[in-house]
Amino acid sequence: MMNGLEKSDPAIVAVKPANKGAQSAPAEWVEPRAGTKGNTDQARTQRTQSRCSVSPGLERVRQAAKAGKKVKFTALLHHVDVELLEWAYFALKRQAAAGVDGLTWQAYGEDLHGNVQALHRRLHRGGYRALPVRRGYIDKGGGALRPLGITAVEDKVVQRAQVEVLSAIYEEDFLEQSYGFRPGRSAHDAMDALCVGIGKDKVNWILDADIRSYFDTIDQEWLIKMVEHRIGDGRVIRLLRRWLRAGVLEDGKYSVSEQGTPQ
């Protein structure tokens, strides 16, 4: 349950059952004070936060996610503060095409602090609304075209900041063999791991597979349900729904799909 737009519930931990004959009720997890010390998995921290200094709050989230795979976080949006939003802006590609509002990265940055302050207020007061995605296409070769969703700069800023928060949780869940769309990892890292595996073990075959139109066919409701296993902050879930349902603008025509996510 949410207490209101201005406040999230405290994070909740689903604790393991006690010894036989006793059952533990779900416990309430409260973030310790910023000065609390603890051992850190430095390698994973570097992967998770390599492009942003680790804030004490997100580090505590990461540690809680690492300690309990069934921890459900109900207080996350407050981590998206002005500082993180400004960092997210500088993490974006400078030369990316403008979205439906025609605003470029450079134009948004002319009054960056003022824009981010206003965005922060709308975000935490429930006034933020995602703009439709502008549809573009890129050549895949052989005459095939890949649809590309071009998001407005301000939406990109919020999304990039939210990714940083969610990565503190999900980087503790992902398998070491996973390389796609993860911070500090690339296709070259995957190839290096493959080369090591081939050289170390006897390999008879390699499977190269691809899911056709993967992003275009994702079931949005199932995606939300999967996220809700870990994320219990209703405001974060509402943000995800707004982005999924923001719609697409192509050749002046607006449409909303109940499946798929913009690329």
Language-model regions: role of each:
Residues 162:
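Nucleotide/phosphate-binding loop and acidic/charged catalytic motifs
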Residues 83-93, 102-145:
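Phosphate/adenylate-binding "loop-and-lid" substructures adjacent to NTP/NAD/dNTP-binding pockets
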Residues 147-152:
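Conserved phosphate-binding loops in nucleotide/dinucleotide-binding enzymes
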Residues 155:
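Short loop/hinge segments at the start of secondary-structure elements
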Residues 158:
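Catalytic-loop motifs flanking and including active-site residues across diverse enzymes
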Residues 115, 122-137, 141-142, 165, ...:
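Conserved polymerase palm-domain catalytic core
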Residues 1-102, 106-113:
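Non-catalytic, polymerase-adjacent accessory regions of viral genome-replication enzymes
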